[in-house]
């Protein structure tokens, strides 16, 4: 299949040093030091009033047990409490109880305890689990613990618990690999989709395109656009944005605008982010007028510019020393409730110093202070030099007015 060939050929050229070893390993058994901690927790647990009901003989329904465990503030008490609960006649573990314990352990970064819970679950096999349970577990290992290899093991271990992953869990792992720039591993996971019973969807293809773009394989990413009909999916704005960004970063604006035209032909409306990518790319290459035209074009299309859009145009005007136009743009932004950046204020002040535009500089400095920015010493020195060098009768008056800010 073209899709697999593209991903394989593209990822095989990425830097192997970026790749992380993802060997499969069994569930970790608690070490002796962890056992000592467990024993100590058991001793302290016995005196916790919040868990007193577990020591009573009254019958406890699963929702009552859940409330008891939810009230536990010290997560080190959870495993001793669970062990005590497992010896009761009304012992009936649920997914909600396991999820609650795992979440508390995750927040406390007690990953060995999570492994102990998973070992217990696998041995007992007393309840069924939803995909959401494993998705949350992968999120904890992938996002909180930074253990991507363990998150992958959870994905492939789901069928052992009678639960098959959907594209949601599968795509989460792919996105995790892209975010970590582990491009070599993407193909290994992708080709396992049939084994896991996962159908490739638009989101999956979007993640692959994003990964290929970030690894510099724009041509392979571009060819993936042809795979959408094969997978009975339709590309969306999230498909095109990484491609447009990639071509803009390489200065290939002709290809970027061709993609914009393709979006319009396929009736995919570009959003503010798409236009911002193009405007920013044009600005960085000094093509300010084209950026301004694009700003007007997006307004005509009914796409509302955001502060980032105007900020990019403002940067472009300042880079070209078009200070009066930049001041007008800044004035409009402020009147619309937007806050220009400190860098734009700094560039504006220094630019006005060069042209000795004292009146305009006075206005900019006041707006800058109103927005909570404090001009640095060097900036004040430039301002003073500018005012004094005017060498006219108004110099002292201008200096007094500006320093009164």
From Swiss-Prot:
PROSITE patterns: PPR (PS51375). It is found in: Mitochondrion. Residues 1-37 form a transit peptide. InterPro entries: Pentatricopeptide_rpt, PPR_P_subfamily, TPR-like_helical_dom_sf. Residues 13-44 are annotated as: Disordered. This is Pentatricopeptide repeat-containing protein At3g14580, mitochondrial. GO terms for cellular component: mitochondrion. It comes from the Eukaryota. Belongs to the PPR family. P subfamily. Keywords: Mitochondrion, Repeat, Transit peptide. PPR repeats lie at residues 94-124, 130-165, 166-200, 201-235, 236-270, 271-305, 306-340, 341-375.
């Amino acid at each position: 299949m073209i899709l697999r060939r593209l991903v394989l050929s593209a990822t095989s050229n990425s830097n192997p040093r970026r790749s992380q070893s993802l060997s499969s390993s069994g569930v970790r058994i608690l070490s002796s030091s962890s056992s000592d901690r467990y024993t100590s927790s058991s001793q302290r647990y016995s005196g916790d009033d919040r868990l007193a009901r577990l020591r009573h003989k009254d019958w406890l329904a699963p929702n009552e047990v859940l409330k008891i465990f939810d009230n536990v503030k010290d997560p080190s008490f959870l495993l001793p409490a669970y062990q005590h609960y497992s010896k009761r006649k009304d012992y009936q573990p649920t997914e909600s109880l396991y999820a609650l314990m795992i979440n508390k352990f995750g927040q406390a970064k007690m990953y060995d305890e999570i492994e102990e819970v998973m070992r217990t679950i696998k041995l007992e096999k007393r309840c069924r689990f939803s995909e959401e349970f494993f998705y949350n577990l992968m999120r904890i290992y992938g996002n909180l613990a930074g253990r991507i290899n363990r998150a992958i093991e959870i994905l492939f271990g789901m069928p052992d618990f009678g639960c098959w992953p959907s594209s949601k869990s599968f795509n989460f792992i792919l996105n995790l690999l892209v975010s970590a720039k582990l491009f070599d591993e993407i193909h290994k996971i992708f080709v396992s989709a049939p084994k896991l019973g996962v159908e490739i969807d638009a989101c999956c293809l979007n993640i692959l395109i994003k990964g290929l773009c970030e690894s510099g394989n724009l041509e392979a990413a571009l060819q993936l656009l042809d795979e959408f009909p094969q997978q009975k999916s339709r590309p969306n704005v999230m498909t095109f944005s990484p491609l447009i960004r990639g071509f803009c970063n390489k200065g290939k604006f002709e290809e970027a605008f061709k993609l914009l035209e393709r979006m319009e032909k396929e009736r995919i409306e570009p959003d503010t982010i798409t236009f911002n990518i193009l405007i920013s790319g044009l600005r960085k290459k000094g093509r300010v007028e084209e950026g301004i035209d694009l700003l007007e074009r997006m307004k005509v299309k009914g796409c509302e510019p955001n502060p980032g859009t105007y900020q990019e145009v403002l940067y472009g005007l300042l880079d070209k020393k078009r200070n009066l136009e930049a001041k007008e743009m800044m004035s409009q932004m402020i009147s619309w409730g937007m806050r220009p950046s400190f860098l734009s204020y700094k560039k504006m002040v220094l630019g006005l110093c060069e042209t000795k535009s004292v009146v305009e500089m006075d206005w900019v400095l006041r707006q800058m202070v109103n927005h909570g920015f404090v001009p640095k010493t060097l900036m004040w020195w430039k301002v003073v030099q500018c005012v004094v060098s005017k060498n006219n009768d108004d110099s002292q008056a201008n200096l007094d007015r500006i320093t009164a800010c």
